[in-house]
Amino acid sequence: MHALRSSVLALWLCLHVSVRAWMTYRSANGLDEYEPEDRIIFVGTKWCGNGNVAEGPEDLGSLKETDACCREHDMCPDLIEAGQSKHGLTNTASYTRLNCACDEKFYNCLKNSSETGSGAVRFTYFTLLGTMCYRNEHPLICVKKGWFSCSKYELDQSQPKRYQWFDVSSNFAFPRMLT
């Protein structure tokens, strides 16, 4: 059963990467008209993916705990849409980026869920997608590079706080969690 679940997850991830590549191509070539059929929603959910297929805020899929986490994440009040600017930051990604507090809450919600699907959603969002979030914090200095991003930061307490981008990763290494 574990091998089947792993194979399904791998297939879903390959499909997701292919669709993201197609969406990036469409956007870069002026074909970024968003169609509902372009949505990829994680199986068993209505809110976990790019957009949602829910009929309303109370409409959840069969993975109710996981879906509730995604719904709350989708409703984050502090976000920067693709191509937009806020807090002196410009989101150059092709998707919305959120305040780190929303991503941290999402991570903890998925981690505390007893459903199997929550682990796959958490792995996809926090490990595979390589997204970023923002927060008002003292400037960061990267003291150790990982494979794809900085793996250890230090805060420069001598400088004033400012809004800045942070890597969202599986270890969720945000400044307030560092020593």
Curated annotation (Swiss-Prot):
It catalyses: a 1,2-diacyl-sn-glycero-3-phosphocholine + H2O = a 1-acyl-sn-glycero-3-phosphocholine + a fatty acid + H(+). Residues 1-21 form the signal peptide. Binds 1 Ca(2+) ion. PROSITE patterns: PA2_HIS. Disulfide bonds join 48-70, 69-109, 76-102, 100-133, 142-150. Glycans are attached at residue 112. Its EC number is 3.1.1.4. Keywords: Calcium, Disulfide bond, Glycoprotein, Hydrolase, Lipid degradation, Lipid metabolism, Metal-binding, Secreted, Signal. Belongs to the phospholipase A2 family. Group III subfamily. This is Phospholipase A2.
